[in-house]
């Protein structure tokens, strides 16, 4: 295993740990296991022996063959060999990533502070001596004799390594994929200073290589580095015979993976190609959900708790992080980790299925303008249910507790003898989030001089907790079991009903309820009354409940298609203090033109100054002035193209579209220009003449748009008016 460290003297050092020998397990008849052991020994350096490990579902010991692999590079291949050799045998721990497995075994994690005992080769330490071949280079590196962690995964006050950071991007709009056509010069930022590289004096790859050698960054943060920047620089360097030291590691090539389209819960999504480095870290801000949502501070937090490699953690889902946290606990408990999900759904009568296959409880909102409204939320409700009631895939309908308490509505049993793996994982995450919340309350939410951004760290942990519920029912989750998913939903429904009944018994009116939130109103109620209600609900349900906010007013909006029908998640709330809460409006949607989103937010800022319906009506006139100003800007041609960009996700390949929708037209324009598009990719376009008889004149892909085409003033004005309509919807009917 190759390790890269920053020493106390700031030296960067490459080390090899040859003591790491991962193992996997095989279950089957004794005679077959004996033959398998002989076959494995004939293929590779392995040590085989019978041992006992715990089965996740039975909770009992299982006799298995332990296969210890002397060369980690053969680990995955030997697991595949077992499949080919005897497909009836069951494998465990055989397809785990080696880096987390190393961390589990050595009790370390990425970015941790460690203490090492190192053996140095006779010709010196890394970097590798010039002129050495690859085989010699491997031996020339210092070897780890012992490693000990001097850090704690669950610490909140931790020190991060002093990483040297370089940022790279192309000139132009960051959100527009440069592969769609328009590419500017390469911009590189080091220590706050930006440099521009183009081909005017030397190849861009040559200039970038020089900066890499001069500044030797530990971390490169890019925009579109995975799919465009680094592949393009590598191609240019290869054609020109240039050496481009993207990697620090002298014996490893840059790792690439292909882009792919896939389906998830009925949505067509796209995962871009990746370019990962060895000896350096590369994070592509356009290809990292967690870096986009929580910046690098949130990414470092996830890396520490999941023990996933930094570059992998940046690009994978938070669900993978939860899975590896579950697997680490299983590993430490001596529990076998199934290679793939092996627990099928239990057979159910149709009546049972109808009862079980339901989500959270929703009480539709009362339409209208309401003053003096409070929002009460169960804190991390689904994770709290898992932790409080021990709901985990292996604990639901266990075989050891026939008299265990039953899940309401469903009658499922929950184990009383062993603590569930998922329950323990979420319990630790909840506790750490609470610690960060306490630190925020003591020192303020915003980071100060030398103080970490606890808000971003807490947000990163939230994303882990958000997905842990879904993974209990995910069809491919190793520790997934649909009955656990159904149990959590059933308990959540029961707790929300208890909360509703408690509120109504105390004279509060329920305006809206959604899974884990209640919007309540009571004439003359003060903040203390709502806090007491939350405490009463918490006492009755056993789940933590918080007063999220007291709102001066809330506007619950109907369906866009049917003005009399309420819909969940289309409303806006103005609190006594803090930010306006918005759901379902255009300014919350990723595909809305920036001009429209900005108009809505400006109008809301004015409306948020109102305290009741009468003052809201007065402020509405001021908000209309905002709308008129934006309409006039469009009319005068004063809107910039960046403000008018509309983004859409492709649901199919460009040539498979049958109808001339705006998305189809723009996609086909890009396709004809030579851009290769795949289902799930995002494209951007400008509306140029929505009513034209010629489809190509209706919209123009952003990277193909020319200034002389202009934009469709009438259509964009129509969109602005539609976006303003929610604010006027109840203006004539009055408050409730």
Model-derived segments and their meaning:
Residues 217-226, 511-512, 519:
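Short glycine-rich phosphate-binding loop at a beta-alpha junction
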Residues 469-476, 508-517:
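Core alpha/beta catalytic barrel or barrel-like domain that forms the active/cofactor pocket
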Residues 3-5, 309-393, 397-398, 449-453, ...:
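DNA-dependent DNA polymerase catalytic subunits
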Residues 188-193, 471-490:
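Gly-rich Lys/Arg/Thr-decorated short loops/hinges at beta-loop-alpha junctions or inter-strand turns
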Residues 183, 190-191, 219-316, 323, ...:
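Metal-dependent phosphoesterase core characteristic of DEDDh/y 3'-5' exonuclease domains
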Residues 1-215, 238-245, 295-297, 304-359, ...:
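DnaQ-like (DEDDh/DEDDy) 3′-5′ exonuclease domain used for proofreading
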Residues 178, 223-236, 385-386, 521-524, ...:
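A short acidic (Asp/Glu
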